[in-house]
């Protein structure tokens, strides 16, 4: 539902209650409560008794700031004050939308160089319900034109659908280079992600001794190197300058 900050929260709480009583509890609803203040979001969720989810404006703001600040942004703080950190089961995550694109009243576009990393941050982690922006997938024409990211997004969507499962372990220990791993499900291979907002770098991360000797490659093609997991289950996963890499087992 759009622009719910202009609608009384008491009404919204009871309205969604009535809708779900008629349509069933699995009738999904989320709202655009356009407010980046952490406490305001916490209070609103309490007022509506968490009967529907909210778009994560705070995370979008963090992604926008990260894209404009470049290497001056501390990537270890990318989820600070966000809904997905405070209320992961009620956060609808997004990178950009029709309000934040260039030329709009709430313009706060995530710069193109950072969009692949931003989408990896919402698509390949265990928390939040991610949304793709039409303009990012298909591109935007006209005065405020933007290239499309369809090829990159298709690869990230494949990784989410087939690889992004299991325990998540974060390696947020460097302001300019972060990473995380997903252990995979019983039938799938693990996944590793590295992001840099500065120079080329690498991140030592544990995949597990069961995968010792296996070779990993970057499915985004941003790093041509491969990574071999050592006998203790660790690998040194590189990332190019101001880039993102998504690593999985090479067939």
Question: What are the functions of these language-model segments?
Answer:
Residues 3-251:
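Active-site-proximal helices and loops of the catalytic beta/alpha 8
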